[in-house]
Each structure stands twice: as structure tokens, then as C-alpha cells.
């Protein structure tokens, strides 16, 4: 294989890895918007909290003498999902439910306030400096090599791909075949009609926040292990990128969030490799603007018709 092709292949691996985690976080944005038509701008901080919870659990278990990588990560996943889900439920009850019927600007201000509160809460309790995470998966598989370059898939990348696939599969099965999943779809179609038909819409909305928070927590554990460092401010940019992915794919569409995340991750990886890391954010948001100019509802979004 040529060195140029191997280099491109490596960037594709990196892009799919990054895009998978963006897609997981974007699920929360798109599900909440699909049902109540609001953006949860505190969602990125839930991702950050998931990273911190997994770090604390893994560190505690390692101090107890447990050093099996998969067991540590599994415990980190469980703890992060439980705590992040509780935060997601609390955000809905505190920041959204009281203002759900108010103007959207009020809900936006409430969400931004919750985001700032969570960010500063973690900064005060855990410190504002970077925290290094223990590296639990260090292996890699060489896919191809030339004289000066080798394309490889690390164990952590493989873990990210597998976990993302399983999480998306579980969510799809839940939405399509479970009773609560059907209730979620009904609320997404028409919230008022779903309420008239006897569906507990408050419960469905709270569940939507919990599911989104759980997905963000999974992404927090994965990216924390992938990058090896976390701080209280990682949630802002990750949240913005995931929001971009959701809008890119068509906000309100779960498959759109998946596609948008992958496109955004690959675009970032390629721009970092062939231009400069300084331009990756520029390329990401420029791509969003370009897509919205051509397809205002995103790739898989549906146009909304408002009757007056």
C-alpha cells in the first residue's frame, strides 16, 4: 500500500472514532428537541460529569488492587450512566419543566444557567486543572504498512466502535419495540395529541432526558479513555460539536444524529491531517453552514409546517 493511502486510511479510522462519540452525545440533543422542541444546552456538562464519575470509580477500584482493564471500564460505564442519568432527570425537573410552556428564550437562558452551574460546581469540587486518566487499553492492530508509515487500529478505538454500535442498537430496539419507545415516538409526532390519548408526557420527556444523559455518559467514558485527560471545561466544546452533528444530520432525527456525528468526525480528522489542527473547528462549523444553506433541515430532517 502507498504511504499516502495508509495516511488517509488512518485519518478515516480517527474520524470514525471521534464521530462515533459525537453521535452518542448528539442523540441527547436530537431526542429532546424532537419531543419538546427545545435544545438542552446543559447536555455537554452531563458528558463531562460522566467522564469524572468514571475516573473516580476506576481510580477507587485501582486503589483496591483491581487492575483488569475491561472490569474497570465496565464499572466506570455503570457508575457514569447511573449518575449522569440522575443529572439528566434533575436538569429536566429543575431547568426545563418549570419553563416548558414559557417562551423559548426563557428555556434557553435556564439551560445556559444550568450549564454554567454544573461547570463551576465540578471546577470547585474537583479542581480546574487537567486530570490524567490511567491508560487501560494499550494494544493495536496494524492494518497496513509501508516503509515510513503504518496504519493501525488501537484497542481503544475498537472498544469505542463496538460500544457505540451496541449503544445505538439498544436505543433503536428500545425506540421501535418497547412500550415507552412507542410513547416517545408518539410524543415526537404530536405531544398534545399523545397527552389526550392518555400518554404520561411528563414521564416520557423525563425519560428522554435520562436516555440522552446516559448516552452522553457513555461518550464521556470513551473519550476520557481515548484522550487520557479530562477537565471541567471539556463539556462545552464537545456539546457544541455534538449539537452541530445533530443539526447537520437533521435535528429530531436519531439516524441523522448518527450520520451527522460521523461526517463531522471524519471532516475534523481530515482537516487536522491535511490542513492544520487549528482549522478543524473552522471546517466543522463551515460544513454546518454549507449543509444548512443547501438543506435547511439537515440531511435527514423533516420540514415543519405550522398552521395559523
UniProtKB/Swiss-Prot annotation:
Signal peptide: none annotated. One of its GO terms (molecular function) is L-leucine transmembrane transporter activity. It is a multi-pass membrane protein. The chain crosses the membrane at residues 22-42, 46-66, 69-89, 105-125, 155-175, 204-224, 246-266, 281-301. GO terms for cellular component: ATP-binding cassette (ABC) transporter complex, substrate-binding subunit-containing; membrane; plasma membrane. Residues 1-21, 67-68, 126-154, 225-245, 302-308 are cytoplasmic. Keywords: Amino-acid transport, Cell inner membrane, Cell membrane, Membrane, Transmembrane, Transmembrane helix, Transport. The keyword Manganese does not apply. The keyword Transmembrane applies. Residues 43-45, 90-104, 176-203, 267-280 are periplasmic. It is found in: Cell inner membrane. InterPro entries: ABC_transp_permease (IPR001851), BCAA_transport_permease (IPR052157). It holds the Pfam family BPD_transp_2. One of its GO terms (biological process) is isoleucine transmembrane transport. It comes from the Bacteria. NCBIfam families: PRK10740.1 (NF008011). Belongs to the binding-protein-dependent transport system permease family. LivHM subfamily. Part of the binding-protein-dependent transport system for branched-chain amino acids. Probably responsible for the translocation of the substrates across the membrane. This is High-affinity branched-chain amino acid transport system permease protein LivH. It comes from Escherichia coli (strain K12).
